[in-house]
Amino acid sequence: MSKIQIQLSDGRNINIDLYEDVAPITVKNFKKLIKENFFDGLCFHRTIKDFMIQGGGFVADGRAIKEKGGADTIKGEFLSNGVKNDLHHGEGVISMARTNVKDSASSQFFICSADCAFLDGQYAAFGKTSDEESLAVVKSISKVPTHSFS
């Protein structure tokens, strides 16, 4: 297990334990993106109360959000894609976001702010918040409304 910290612009942090034994490809990719500073300056662009917060793909400048892009896709490490991954999508679990294509995850991730058992076996869960303070930060972010720029 390795540990990472997501540092927010308001000074709060989200501490996360990464589980290499559950999703080795996903953790390796996530750590590579961290080492490359890929996530620096990105925002949580999708927040849904009592569900999750999603980030890892967009930059916000106060007026609009822009997709960052440029990250390679990886194999989806979850049961419906033929990979054993029994990490339950409970509160605080971090998982890879993807399109309907099972091997389309790249940099976007989400952190569950509630129990999301319906996601089990469908998305590559690969870690969990390390402490109650981090989970409280996730839950508070999930209550922030986001806007559509369509």
Task: Explain the meaning of each model-derived region.
Residues 1-150:
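Cyclophilin-like peptidyl-prolyl cis-trans isomerases
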